[in-house]
Structure formats: structure tokens, C-alpha cells
From Swiss-Prot:
This is Ribosome maturation factor RimM. One of its GO terms (cellular component) is cytoplasm. Its main location: cytoplasm. Keywords: Chaperone, Cytoplasm, Ribosome biogenesis, rRNA processing. It comes from Hydrogenovibrio crunogenus (strain DSM 25203 / XCL-2) (Thiomicrospira crunogena). Residues 100-177 form the PRC barrel domain. Binds ribosomal protein uS19.
Length: 181
């Protein structure tokens, strides 16, 4: 099912504990560096399949930046904070700063990938960080089942063109390199 723009949310982390007695929460952040999650407010917090909005009153990195704690408006004691453990934290796409050029990785998810020969390779389902180069996981349903292709994200070598507006990526890659899942 496709979601409308208004339904799109960007998951930035999760509340994974409580900190102190005044309602502070521990955060597992997906941002890099981890404390960048504190740059965004308000947060959308998913509580029992419903998104609630919270202003971030304060926040800081702990343990040399390895963890993050935050104080959210309206959560003023340890017992109330405990109710939010396990809840996802998200923001709306318009809260992201505009990129001067380029794009955010999350904008590549769902893009249709075609080879220079015009062959449909499938859709980007994931971006895998490998250390050397990030890798696009592209999946396509075929008669033999789900075909998964890993394509190194190396501009001008394998990735020839990215158009996030039309959700299209052109690559110099062939399906013979694919593996079935």
C-alpha cells in the first residue's frame, strides 16, 4: 500500500529507557552522529499505533556521544516516562534541512531501478552500509520468486543517474549478478 505524502514519517530512533526521576527518557538514535536527533523538534512518538506530538524541552549526549537522553514536554515523572519505552520517534519530511545538491538515503527507498539497456531491475528496498561503499538492495518479483540484487552505490561507475522526484535510478548493472532470496 502506498502512503500519501501527509502520512510519510522518517523514523529517527526509539525510546529505550528512562533516565532519572523527572521524566527524562533514553533514546536509541539512528542519526549520525547520534545526538543529531536532538536537532529536531517536535518529535512524533508512536504510542499504541497512534502518533503523538512532543516538543523536545532539553536533551544531551551521554557517555561520549554513545547514548542520548531527552526531556519531552508533558512527561514529568519516571512512571509516565516508562510508558513510552519501546515507542518509535519520527519527524515529518519537511523538518529535514534542504540539501544543496544530492538527496537523503531514505529518498532512494522505493525508487525504480533500470539498467542502461532499459532492463527493469526492480525497486530499492534497503541501503546497506558495508564500510567500503553503501549498497542498494534492489528487489523484483519474477517467475522464479523474489530476485534480490545488490548494487554498490558508486556514482558514475555503477550509479549513472538518480532522479528522486520521479523515483528513478539508472545503473550500469545486469541481472546476471542477482541472487534469489
Amino acid at each position: 500500500m502506498m502512503s500519501s505524502k501527509q502520512d510519510e514519517k522518517i523514523i529517527l530512533g526509539q525510546i529505550n529507557g528512562i533516565y532519572g526521576v523527572q521524566g527524562w527518557v533514553k533514546i536509541f538514535s539512528h542519526t549520525d552522529p547520534r545526538q543529531n536527533i536532538l536537532s529536531y523538534s517536535p518529535w512524533l512518538v508512536k504510542v499504541k499505533n497512534e502518533w503523538r506530538t512532543f516538543q523536545v524541552e532539553e536533551g544531551r549526549a551521554q557517555q561520549g556521544g554513545k547514548s542520548v537522553v531527552a526531556k519531552l514536554e508533558g512527561i514529568d515523572d519516571r512512571d509516565l516516562a516508562r510508558e513510552y519505552i519501546g515507542c518509535e520517534i519520527a519527524i515529518l519530511p519537511e523538518q529535514l534541512p534542504a540539501t544543496e545538491e544530492g538527496f537523503y538515503w531514505m529518498q532512494l527507498i522505493g525508487c525504480q531501478v533500470t539498467s542502461v539497456e532499459g532492463e527493469d531491475l526492480g525497486q530499492v528496498t534497503e541501503i546497506v552500509e558495508t564500510g567500503a561503499h553503501d549498497v542498494l538492495r534492489v528487489e523484483k518479483q519474477s517467475d522464479a520468486g523474489l530476485v534480490s540484487t545488490l548494487i554498490p552505490f558508486v556514482m558514475e561507475t555503477f550509479i549513472l543517474d538518480v532522479d528522486v522526484e520521479s523515483k528513478q535510478i539508472q545503473v550500469d548493472w545486469q541481472l546476471e549478478d542477482a541472487t534469489e532470496s
